[in-house]
Amino acid sequence: FYVTKKGVCVNTKDMGTAVDPASMNVGWYYNWDWKSFKDMSFSNKKFDDLEFVPMIWGDSMTETSEIFDNVKSKGYKYLLAYNEPDLKWESNVRPDVMQYRWNDCVNNKGNVRLGSPAVSVFPTWSNDWWTPFWNSMAADKKNAMSFIAVHSYQKSYDGAKSALQYLQAIDECWETYHKPIWITEFAFWKFSINDAAGCAKVQEFMKIVIKGLNERSYVERYSWFSFNTTDNSNGASALWTNSTGKLTDLGNIYVNN
C-alpha cells in the first residue's frame, strides 16, 4: 500500500484545533480543501508533517486548473474530487454537469491519482446520481479514475451481521467497478456518547470493519468521520473531544486496530 491505510478527516472550524495526529496512528489527512493546514497557517501545527491529500470540494472553489497547478507544484500524489455532489446542501452538482467537471479534472490531472466524486451513499446504491454519471462516461474518462471515494453512515446496528453487511457492500463496489477504494467518510448517525449500549455497538462495528478493511488489498485508505462528543445525536462516533483533543474510547480503538 502507498502508506498506512488509516487517515483522519478534520476541518479548521472545530475538529482539528486541538487533536494531535501523532496520537492517532494515522498516515494521512484531508480537510475538504485543496490547501493544507500548513499553507493556511492553521493554528494547530501538529499536522504540518503529516501527508496531506487535497480536495476539489465543489464549484465554489478556485478554478480547476489553478487547483491542479497547486497540487503539482506541491508534489501531491492524490486528489479527491467533489464532496457529495448528490446532496443540495453539499457540493450539489448534477450528474450531467459533473461530466464536464470530470473532463476538466482528467485534462488537468497529469500524473496525479484522481479520486471519483464522493456520493453520500455507496456508489452501487446511488441510482439517481452515480449510476447515470458512470454510465454516461466515456471509457477513457473511466480509466482516468484512479480510485473510488466512498462515504457511508450507519443508521442502525444488528450485531456483527451489520458490520459484515457493510464489508459486503464494499466488496460489491469493488466487484462492480474494479477500482481501488478510499473510504473517506464513515461513522454512525446514531447514539449519544452517554448511551453506553450505543457506544458498545459503534465500538464493535469499528473493530470488525477496520479488520476487514485492513485485510482487503483493494481498500487503499480509509478515514472515520469523528463527530464531537457534545453531539447529542452522534457523539458515540467521536474519536476525540474537539475542545481538548483527548481521545475517546472509540478513538483508542481506532488507534489500536
Located regions from the model:
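Active-site clefts of carbohydrate-active enzymes
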Residues: S116, T176-E204, F225-T241
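Aromatic- and acid-rich polysaccharide-binding/catalytic face
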Residues: N31, P54, K77, N83, ...
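Loop/turn elements at helix/coil->beta-strand transitions in domains of secreted/extracellular proteins
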Residues: Y2-K6, S23-W28, D48-F52, K74-L79, ...
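Solvent-exposed loop/turn segments at secondary-structure junctions
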Residues: T12-M15, D33-F37, W57-M61, N83-K88, ...
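Aromatic-rich peripheral "rim/lid" segments of glycoside hydrolase catalytic domains that contact
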Residues: K46-P54, N194, G212-N257
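An active-site-proximal structural segment forming one wall of the substrate-binding cleft
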Residues: W57-A81, S91-V112, S126-M145, E172-W174, ...
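N-terminal carbohydrate-binding/catalytic regions of secreted carbohydrate-active enzymes
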Residues: Y2-Y78, R101-D104
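Alpha-helix N-cap and loop-to-helix initiation/capping positions
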Residues: V93-Y100, W125, D158-Q165, A196-F205, ...
